[in-house]
Amino acid sequence: MKAGSIADRAPAARTGSSKNGGHKTPAPRAEAIIDPATPVSNGVTGTVERPAMTAHYIRSRIGKICVAITGPTPADMMRNAEQIIRENHFVEFRLDYLPNPLAIIPKIKTFLYERGEVTAIATCRRAATGGKFRGAIAAELEVLEKAALAGCHMIDVELQTAEHMKPAQMQRLRSRGAALIVSYHDFEATRDLDKIFERIRPFQPEFMKIVSTAKNLTDNITMMRFLERCRDEAELIGITMGEQGTISRVLGLRAGSVFTFASAHAGEETGPGQIEARTLREAWRIDQIDLSTKVYGVVGNPVKHSLSPLMQNIAFRRETVNAVFLPLQTTKLHDLLTLVKEIPLHGLAVTMPFKTEIIKHLEKTDALSQKIGACNTVVRAQDGKLYGFNTDVAAVVRPLERRLQLKGTKILVLGAGGAARAAVFGLVEKGAEVFIWNRTPDAAKKLARQAKAKTIRKEQLAKSTFDVIVNTTPVGMRGVKPASILEPKEINARLVFDLVYNPIDTPLIRMAREKGLPVITGVEMFVHQGARQFEIWTGKPAPEEEMLRVVVHALRQQSAEKTDKS
């Protein structure tokens, strides 16, 4: 393996003679002399045969994203296909999602005949290998054979199926003209990828698809190094699934994956962690990612519902910055630090629970981060060293300063984590009298001592009044339980500020409004601190109004979708 980070290892041209990683390259298939889509009658057997479509021919037709098409009935699946091809001409028909896959074959034949610009994969994955098809191998092969004859350009055969096929079955399937993808899916972990490669090699498919599950962030590194090692020896599609596998879905292309898979819409994923095609193309600009693209991310647990990737990617696009921003969910900081070095990452937005822990791994932090002991922004300098900043303090203090005089105000801060430290130190600095309540009293007492604040017990809240209540905990965040950190009787203040931004109307915000209290939602703080992060990373003024617009739009859209489902 070549030295250096993944981004440093430029792709090499496929020569057909590479021996990287100990793999030998099979002889390349001869290019079809006639149009690969033209059927040929076998005068001896009377069967219809077509020359197999070559990888070169397929690559000349496709883009970087293959959109998976699903549907409970043939009519639904074809209706979805009609919608998808308006923006995406490379699709996968997931035939295993249908109770009777053979019923859709005539419709696919007509569809592809009338739309020559569309390139299609046919997949009928059996339940035993992670799909939904309940039939036997022979039934699966019948579906794929007829899909190939109907005009599908590629057929996906799971490795376990290929290993059970007789030579005559494979020869018959290959004679139907479609390029062969032999695929392997590991829904549990990322194991020996080279071993899987060697199992697939004897079948000499036009494409190899190897998919694993990321149990941590560094599993993405394992997959991308594998792609780099073997990209000169085969046409590879490599992906890690799961919430922690997003990196491979976005950056795997520059490591050597021929294309990646995407869902047509949110909620229609055919694999764990699959991303909506429009998000990949418009927000993350996957078609423009190259070896010079800088990589940033939001790290924490959880970050599944974070809108930081949307907000920052839109800002990068608006200011023509060649960069991409990814969600990096992890429970272990050393997992992240390995990723920072290997990709390499150029900057981080740090969220719970790492705002304090990350400081000891940085070369230097700004005075504010040192003072409060929490850092939410990391930038990688040209020398590779990591430097930390805090943009949370200003993002908490400024919205409050716009509404009231902080000096002498009585403020209740809920929580004692990194965001709480920013709020408490920032508010004390402005002359406020700050009280801290946390479910773990010792953490509250420690923060109070350090910041010259006070603590308060839970039973005192209902009898106490404050000028402001500030929630710095994740309670109320989408996907986090319990729903509210306070009961209505404990909300006794002139103003309520919830740092949780997703959803906009958290349970705490709703209860405050029901009591007639003015509120500050977390969106204001979220966008403000994100804008400052953008400026630290890029040295350019942040398009703050545009960032606010896309965040509010996304949150309202999520709220509307949730209402429609309820």
Tell what function each PLM region has.
Residues 430-451:
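NAD(P)-binding Rossmann-fold cofactor-contacting core
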Residues 449-519, 524:
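Rossmann-like adenosine-cofactor binding region
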Residues 2, 42-77, 285-293:
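N-terminal amphipathic alpha-helix/helix-capping segment at the start of soluble metabolic enzymes
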Residues 296-303, 400, 404, 409-428, ...:
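Glycine-rich adenosine-cofactor-binding loop
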